[in-house]
Curated annotation (Swiss-Prot):
This is Probable phosphoenolpyruvate synthase. Homooligomer. Forms a large complex of about 2000 kDa. The lineage of its organism: Archaea, Thermoproteota, Thermoprotei, Desulfurococcales, Desulfurococcaceae. The keyword Cytoplasm does not apply. The N-terminus is blocked. It comes from the Archaea. Its cofactor is Mg(2+).
Length: 834
């Protein structure tokens, strides 16, 4: 190592660098050095220091030319900005590098080759910028300076180091610094020179979900070849979501990857290859592709093996642990090296979006609803879907633009929706004007996604065909939280949100004041709801979802007609649309919290009360245990009406993009009826899955006895304590006499024993258990029993949400203390020799 103080050296090895050297080597290099010291597999290399760059511009006199010129211009004048920055970059490239700096770069390149055991002229390296302000927590500056891959030979390395220095003065970099309030004089440039990984697969990963901010997962994006295709948003990459605790893959999306960037050893350069669907082969503009590694690529094949996904997740957690912060990481898998040594980390930076985001959502701006084509959510046509890259709602006139320097780009107005194939840093001035952004290509960590989140602009990426489907000049609404673009201005989504106070149970405080007051509980606290409009009053209460959404109110108040009557009149759409509108109102207001919608549970006498109902409903002596629940859905006479309910659910989930809606079957008596009802759902296109849960009400004693059998058909149960008490005790819930005598009591030992049986049997099969009857809202002692029995969630009336959450937290603490005391007693006995 050199005797010259580190801060005065032109070059330092990466393994000499620590996080304290950010000023000298920039954020990227400092992070690489930190990871090497932490034992993370990082390709070897060296850093051309910021001091070398500073020495260059001072010794050559460029400093006195560059900064006065830059500080004299208006960066919002794009023409002047482009001309000025181009002139500065040319000055840098035309000015010879001081010999003492150039020779150091050549020397270290030769030494790197020697360390690796390669001939210098054959050593391929990545030459990357590492600006001293680039990785500040306040701004990610995604793609601000240049990166050059597969560079080889001393002359080329020297040339591309200068190119990196010059990239400090692109229009986009200058614009960003001004926008972030960073003085140009304080922005210096270090350069990474690092051995290239022969990338079979490359990509990015986050140690939290980049869209939702979920801290319990690692999100990995991958595609074939070099990572430039992923980072640059040129391809929609494969995606894996990995649970941090178990390292199990909890979600996986394999996309059609038709583009890759690879190094062609015969041509000695990187080439962009595309999948030819007709030839079923990879081709480039220069003809057929004859690269050994590419033979293993296929557009629909996962770009990573499961073992590689888990290895990457392990490394992500090590890096996160080392820094104590959420991280944004670039990685590559080497084609020539066997697993697990083939996985390398090539960059890591602090995650910048969720790190600085407060509770406010910039994306959801308060604005008057303006537009010619104003529609309701239930009537809105879905134009395209994509990956929800930046949350929020944006609505306005769409403009399809393919070139950020085109006439169309110059005419782009503030408040319009930008629709394009993909973005790179040249698009930033346009992006800042946009009310929302939609791209054909890219993943959640593409340039469009990163910058949109940083700017607080709703964005959807990877739609595939937005530029073809969306026409310039039409009004659209972009839902960046769900990845859906609607035609028209959807008033339900864009209307101003007023401050809503939680005036429940005597609580009259704002959501901001309320949030810190409630404790976190292991047992989920859900809320029961019947009237959709009431969600505006209650949505800011501390509940984890809607555990029971009754649709009977929507049918009686919004639809009013018997569904079979509407079918006979040819007005099925009225029923579907109204039901969908009511459900969507609730699901939209609390997204992404789940909404468990119970299919209709009218009794025959209640159905007769609907307009036109008398024709279709028999008169029963005991409707409470008569033709209700699932028995109606599978009956040939009523099945068409049940199908309307299923279609409404499907519309909410698939057309409106509200995938937080689940369903629940009421009054389930047998497994065979449940099986038949599920089959009808499947025929209508709704099938149980990872993101679509199906529950059953547990209110008939047959479920108590056979919960483990019923669990084969559903994901969870919700105990209806009212009907369950009635049927276990044989006590009519509507009988005042029996109630006064104390017969109808959910706390009866027989009822509690039945509830405990349901929980135990359901859990033995992996099903969850909730309760949505009135008991928890009325009897605190039942809540304690339920928590101790291991129930997964408790759904209560709005006025009981806060009290129940606090009660559950207290009970959970008491249970933990009991267990701790037992452990301590055992330890004490062991120490005393008992």
């Amino acid at each position: 190592m050199s005797n010259v103080p580190k801060e005065k050296r032109f070059i330092v090895w990466l393994d000499e660098v620590t996080k304290d050297d950010v000023v000298l080597v920039g954020g990227k290099n400092a992070n690489l050095g930190e990871m090497i010291r932490a034992g993370i597999p990082v390709p070897p290399g060296f850093a051309v220091t910021a001091y070398a760059y500073k020495y260059f511009i001072e010794k050559t006199g460029l400093k006195d030319k560059i900064y006065p010129l830059l500080n004299s211009i208006d960066v919002n004048d794009k023409k002047v900005l482009d001309e000025t920055t181009a002139k500065i970059r040319q000055w840098i490239m035309d000015t010879p590098m001081p010999p003492e700096v150039e020779e150091e770069i050549r020397k270290y390149y030769r030494e790197l080759a020697k360390k690796i055991g390669m001939e210098p002229e054959k050593l391929r390296v990545a030459v990357r910028s590492s600006a001293t302000a680039e990785d500040m927590p306040e701004a990610s500056f995604a793609g601000q300076q240049d990166t050059y891959l597969n560079v080889y030979g001393e002359d080329n390395v020297v040339y591309y180091v200068k190119r990196c220095w010059a990239s400090l003065f692109t229009s986009r970099a200058v614009f960003y610094r001004v926008a972030q309030g960073i003085p140009h004089e304080k922005s210096l440039m270090s350069v990474t020179v690092q051995k290239m990984v022969n990338s079979r697969t490359a990509g990015v990963m986050f140690t939290l979900h980049p869209v939702t901010g979920d801290e319990k997962v690692v999100v990995i994006e991958a595609s074939w070849g070099l990572g430039e295709s992923v980072v640059g948003g040129k391809v929609t990459p494969d995606e894996w979501v990995v649970d941090k605790q178990t390292l199990q893959i909890v979600d996986q999306k394999i996309h059609h990857k038709t583009l890759a960037i690879v190094f062609d050893p015969k041509k000695g350069k990187n080439v962009e290859i595309r999948w030819d669907e007709n030839k079923q082969a990879w081709v480039s503009e220069e003809g057929p592709v004859d690269i050994e590694m590419v033979k293993h690529f296929h557009p629909d094949k996962p770009a990573l093996k499961e073992e590689e996904v888990k290895r990457l997740a392990e490394l992500a957690l090590l890096i996160e642990k080392h820094y104590g912060r959420h991280m944004d990481i670039e990685w590559a898998v080497d084609y020539d090296i066997p697993f697990p040594d083939n996985v390398f980390i090539v960059q890591a930076r602090l995650e910048t979006v969720w790190s600085v985001r407060k509770e406010k959502e910039k994306a959801e701006k308060k604005a008057e609803i303006k537009g010619k084509n104003i529609v309701k959510l239930s009537e809105a046509k879905v134009l395209v879907r994509g990956l929800p890259a930046s949350p929020g709602i944006g609505a306005g006139v769409a403009k399809v633009i393919f070139d950020p320097h085109s006439k169309e780009a110059q005419e782009f107005k503030e408040g319009e929706v930008l629709v394009t194939k993909m973005t790179d840093p040249d698009w930033v001035p346009l992006m800042k004007k946009a009310v929302a952004i939609v791209t054909d290509e890219g993943g959640m960590t593409s340039h469009a996604a990163i910058v949109s989140r940083e700017l607080g602009i709703p964005a959807i990426v990877g739609t595939g065909n937005a530029t073809q489907v969306i026409k310039s000049g039409i009004e659209v609404t972009v839902d960046g939280s769900r990845g859906v673009v609607y035609e028209g201005i959807v008033e339900d989504l864009v209307k101003p949100k007023e401050e809503v106070k939680a005036e429940v149970a005597g609580v009259g405080i704002s959501p901001e004041q309320l949030l810190p007051l409630y404790p976190v509980t292991a047992t989920k606290i859900y809320m029961n709801l019947g009237e959709p409009d009431a969600i505006e009053k209650y949505k800011d209460l501390p509940f984890d979802g809607i555990g029971l959404m009754r649709i009977e109110f929507i049918i009686t108040d919004w639809v009013q007609y018997h569904p079979l009557y509407l079918i006979e009149q040819g007005k099925e759409s009225l029923f579907i649309d109204k039901l969908a509108e009511g459900i969507a109102k609730v699901a939209q207001a609390i997204y992404p919290r789940p909404v468990v919608v119970r299919f209709s549970d009218f009794k025959t006498n209640e159905y007769r009360g609907l307009k036109g109902g008398e024709k279709y409903e028999p008169e029963e002596r005991n409707p409470m245990i008569g033709w209700r629940g699932v028995s109606r859905y599978i009956h040939p006479k009523y099945e068409p009406a049940f199908r309307l309910e299923v279609r409404a659910i499907k519309k909410v989930r698939e057309e409106m993009g509200l995938t937080n809606v689940w369903v629940m079957f009421p009054f389930v008596r047998t497994t065979w009826e449940l099986e038949r009802a599920l089959k009808i759902m499947e025929e209508e296109g709704l099938k149980r899955g990872k993101d679509f849960k199906v529950w059953a009400m547990a209110e008939v004693p047959s479920i108590v006895l056979l919960a483990d059998k019923f669990a084969e058909y559903v994901d969870g149960f919700s105990i209806g304590s009212n009907d369950l008490t009635q049927l276990i005790l044989g006590a009519d819930r509507d009988s005042n006499i029996l109630a006064e005598m104390g017969y109808f009591d959910e706390r009866d030992p027989a009822v509690l024993a039945g509830i405990k049986m349901i929980i135990e049997k359901a859990h033995s099969k992996g099903a969850t258990v909730s309760i949505c009857g009135q008991a928890p809202s009325v009897y605190p002692e039942i809540v304690e029993f339920l928590v101790e029995a291991g129930i997964d969630s408790i759904s209560v009336n709005p006025d009981a949400v806060i009290a129940t959450r606090r009660l559950v937290a207290s009970i959970e603490r008491k249970i933990m203390l009991k267990r701790l005391n037992k452990i301590m007693d055992k330890l004490n006995k062991l120490e005393l020799g008992f």
